[in-house]
UniProtKB/Swiss-Prot annotation:
One of its GO terms (biological process) is iron ion transport. Keywords: Ion transport, Iron, Iron transport, Transport. It comes from Leptolyngbya boryana (Plectonema boryanum). Signal peptide: none annotated. SMART domains: FeoA (SM00899). Might be involved in Fe(2+) ion uptake. This is Putative Fe(2+) transport protein A. Belongs to the FeoA family. Pfam families: FeoA. One of its GO terms (molecular function) is transition metal ion binding.
């Protein structure tokens, strides 16, 4: 897992109620991961808010709340926002 950089952070490092804008989706994780994220409306430029980290990782995407598995979390990098 990559930590913070000038460009942003791994989604997994955000705490509940922190927001970010999706800046990168790791394509090395395969087409299935990218397709699954698209089906959840998570694409480059999408604003997301971490709602909960455990027992399930819940993310607010617009008006929707989605649960992300570890592989999906690992694929998302965000630029922090306030």
């Amino acid at each position: 897992m990559t930590g913070f950089t000038i460009e942003g952070s791994s989604l997994k490092l955000l705490k509940p109620q922190e927001q970010g804008v999706v800046s990168r989706i790791d394509s090395s994780r395969g087409d299935f991961v990218a397709q699954k994220l698209r089906s959840m409306n998570i694409t480059l430029g999408t604003r997301v808010t971490v709602e909960q980290r455990s027992p399930r990782f819940l993310l607010r995407v617009g008006a929707d709340q989605v649960a992300l598995s570890d592989p999906l979390q690992d694929a998302i990098y965000v630029r922090l926002s306030r």
